[in-house]
Each structure stands twice: as structure tokens, then as C-alpha cells.
A protein has these predicted regions:
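Surface-exposed, polar/charged faces of alpha-helical domains
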Residues: 90-91, 116-123, 130-134, 141, ...
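Bacterial signal peptide processing site
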Residues: 19-21
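C-terminal motif of bacterial Sec signal peptides marking the signal peptidase cleavage site
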Residues: 13-17
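Bacterial N-terminal signal peptides that target proteins for export
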Residues: 1-5
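Surface-exposed, low-hydrophobicity interaction/linker segments
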Residues: 44, 48-102, 120-136
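A short acidic-to-branched-hydrophobic micro-motif
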Residues: 107-117
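A short, solvent-exposed beta-edge/loop patch
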Residues: 102-103, 114, 139-184
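Post-signal peptide N-terminal segment of mature Sec-exported envelope proteins
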Residues: 25-45
Length: 188
């Protein structure tokens, strides 16, 4: 009887820690940005002055100098040539913002698109990737394409020279670590 009691006590002692588990560290859910422009302004604000280059934001009809800007969707058809949004995908965009290198768009171009209801980031991102990869480039050749999404709400597309893309990607990751990558690859 004593042997059984001792065996039972040893088993209870051995298994006492089985129910415990180390606390799991979770990354808090990131708050959804209020607008496409907020995403670009947040990233641009992370740049040191020494990293910044001359940019223009928005579109030609309503541009902002040296800052990201909202893209006036009254002129949405222009997104096909300056942000490479396929013509059949313009209706997928509910809101847009951009920042483009002032001297040469192929050096750096970025658009953030808030998607219309029912549009998936995966489908829109794939269409953007095809458009960039199949574009006929003039006045320089961008080196890298980056496409990220924030759920099915926002898709960010950026392309440019690595000297511009590397700090942009770094600051984007700092500002929005929860964004998922759809594409990050060399432009062939």
C-alpha cells in the first residue's frame, strides 16, 4: 500500500508540469490604416533627410511636391500609364495615393490602392505584377518590383532602382510589419 502511494505521489510530481506551457508571444494585430495616403505618409516620415529624394505625389492634375499625395480618381484612366494599373482593373480601385521620383519614374514609383468591395488583394496584386513585368520601359530600367497587401483592403506596388527600393522596403517593413508580400523580385 505504501509502495502504491509513493508511486502515485511520484507520478503526480512528474506530471505536475505537463499542463504548463510557456506563454506564446504574439504580435498584436496592426491597426488598419485610414487611407492609402496614410500608408505612404507614414513610410515617408521614417526616411532620414539624407535618404530622401525629390518626389511628386498624387497625379498630374492634382500633384503635391516633395510628399506623397492622393490620386484624384476623376483622372483614374491615367493610372494605366503612370502607375501601370491595367485598364480593366481601374474599377477595382476605390482610392489611391502615389509617390514618384520627380526626375525619372523608373527610378522609383509607388502606388497604394484601396480596393473596392469584393476585390481580392491576390487577384489585384497578380494583375499589377503582370503589368509591371510586361511593361515596355523607356528612359531607364527599374530593377526591383515590390507588391504587398494589407488584407484585402490595400495593395501597395513599388518599382525602381535598388538604391531607392532598399530604404523604401526597410521603412515600409518598420511602419507596417503586418503587410504580406505578394511579390518582391527583380524585373526581368
Amino acid at each position: 500500500m505504501i509502495a502504491i502511494a509513493l508511486a502515485l505521489a511520484m507520478m503526480l510530481t512528474m506530471f505536475a508540469g505537463c499542463g504548463k506551457s510557456e506563454p506564446v508571444e504574439t504580435v498584436p494585430a496592426q491597426e488598419m490604416p485610414a487611407s492609402a495616403l496614410e500608408i505612404l505618409e507614414t513610410v515617408w516620415a521614417k526616411y532620414d533627410d539624407s535618404e530622401k529624394f525629390s518626389i511628386v505625389g498624387g497625379n498630374i492634375e492634382a500633384n503635391i511636391m516633395d510628399a506623397p499625395g492622393n490620386y484624384d480618381l476623376t483622372y483614374a484612366e491615367n493610372m494605366t500609364w503612370n502607375l501601370l494599373v491595367p485598364a480593366d482593373r481601374i474599377a477595382d480601385v476605390a482610392e489611391a495615393a502615389s509617390m514618384i521620383h520627380m526626375m525619372n519614374a523608373n527610378t522609383f514609383t509607388c502606388g497604394v490602392f484601396k480596393l473596392a468591395d469584393g476585390v481580392t488583394a491576390a487577384n489585384f496584386g497578380a494583375a499589377m505584377k503582370d503589368a509591371v513585368m510586361n511593361n515596355q520601359w523607356m528612359c531607364g530600367f527599374p530593377e526591383t518590383l515590390l507588391i504587398r497587401n494589407f488584407g484585402d483592403s490595400y495593395v501597395l506596388m513599388a518599382f525602381g532602382l535598388n538604391d531607392a527600393m532598399t530604404p523604401f522596403e526597410k521603412h515600409l517593413s518598420e511602419a507596417y510589419p503586418g503587410m504580406e508580400t505578394i511579390a518582391n523580385e527583380p524585373i526581368a
